[in-house]
Amino acid sequence: ANTNLRDISSVAVRISRQVRGLAEPLLRALWEPDGFPSTLVLAPPGVGKTTLLRDMICALSDGDEQRPACRVGIVDERGELAAMYRGVPQLEVGAHTDVLDGCPKALGITMLLRSANPQVIAVDEITAEEDLRAMLSAAHCGVALLATIHAANREELARKPLFALSLIHISEPTRLRRI
């Protein structure tokens, strides 16, 4: 623990909320005959990316009449998706979901690939090169990726040096679509 904090000028408190059903129209539009495709949710800060991601995870994990349940692995580095307490998610993330809480994304993605047999791996707010490398590795193993990133649109994302090349490697241009 960092005990060197002092002279604090402000504190920001984020209160997460669950919005069940939020992801349903999006999942209907994305779902393909062979399952869930890798999906990157782009939006500016503060508009609900994490709330949407959590509901997508829950819906994929639980399944319904149109979609079978998926095995989902979450790498919840900052504890915002599942809000784990004593090993139990305090927010709904679905019945078939494994959560790695407080684990760095790159390490967690690798751990899930090796031990959890996920069909989908979900992470919130990707920012680091090592996270992208781990995601590319997972994509090459046949696992669908579900992630969020701060960007208003594809053009802004393409201007981020870290992601410009990765966009080409992760998805086929014919499958890029705006929903």
Tell where the protein language model's regions lie, with residue ranges.
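P-loop NTP-binding catalytic core
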Residues: 1-37
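Conserved lysine of the Walker
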Residues: 49
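The conserved Walker
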Residues: 45
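P-loop NTPase switch/communication element
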Residues: 61-110
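Hydrophobic anchor at the beta1->P-loop junction of P-loop NTPases
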Residues: 41
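Hydrophobic positions on the alpha1 helix immediately C-terminal to the Walker A/P-loop
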Residues: 52, 56
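Residue-level detector of conserved catalytic or cofactor/ligand-binding positions
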Residues: 168-179
